[in-house]
Amino acid sequence: MSTRQEILRATERLIRRKGLSRVTTKQIAQEVGFAEGTLFNHFRDKSDLFGAVLVENLPPLMEISTSDRAGQGTVGANLREIALAAIKFFDKVVPLAASVFADIELRTQHRAALRRSKGGPHHLFEHLAKYVAAEQSLGRIQPQVDPLGVAVLLLAPCFHWVFIKRANGQNLFKITDAEFVNLTVRTLEHAIRSEIRKLS
C-alpha cells in the first residue's frame, strides 16, 4: 500500500470515529504513524485530503461499469452488478460527503478542488453511459435508448436508496439491497422496452 493510500485510509477511519469537524491533520499523522508534513507531500491542504477520501472508492466502481465489459454476460446482469457496486460506494461515501457539505469552508474548498482537477461525481454517470453506448453498438440495446438517461435512471435511485437508509438509521422498505436492485433494473428494462415500442 502506498503512503498516499495509508493516509487516506487513516483519515477515513478518523472521520467515521470522531466526525469530520473534530479531525485534525495532527491526529491523522498520529493515526498513520507519519510526520504531519508528510501529509502535505501528497495533498494540497486538509480539504484536498478530505475530498480525496470521498472519491477513494470511485475507481473500482468505474472499472465495473467500463465499456470493456460490453458484450459479456447479459445487459441486465451487468446493470445489476453495477447497481450493487454503486450502492456499496454510496453507502461508504454519503456519511463522509454529508460532513463536508455541512461545513461551508470545506464545501467551498472541495468544489474548487473539483474544478481544478476537472473531477466530480458526474464522471460516474458518463462512464456508465459509455457502457450503454457500447452495448448499443453491439446491438444489445436498441439505438433509440438514451445512454445518459439509462445511467441517471439506474444510479440516482441507488443513491437515494442509501440516503434514505442512512437518514432513518434503518431499512424501512424491508427488502435487501439485491432485491432493490432487481426491482430497479426490471423496472428500467420495462420502461426502455415500452419507450422503444412507442417510438417504433
Regions found by a protein language model. Name each.
Residues 77, 81, 88, 122, ...:
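C-terminal peripheral helix-coil segments that are non-catalytic and often amphipathic
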Residues 17-21, 93, 138:
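Short coil/turn segments at alpha/beta junctions that flank glycine-rich nucleotide-binding fingerprints
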Residues 10-14, 52, 85, 157:
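Short amphipathic alpha-helical elements of helix-turn-helix/winged-helix folds
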Residues 6, 14-48, 52-56:
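Helix-turn-helix
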Residues 4-5, 25, 47, 72, ...:
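Short, structured helix-loop boundary elements
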Residues 88-127:
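Short secondary-structure transition hinges
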Residues 54-82:
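Amphipathic alpha-helical linker/stalk segments
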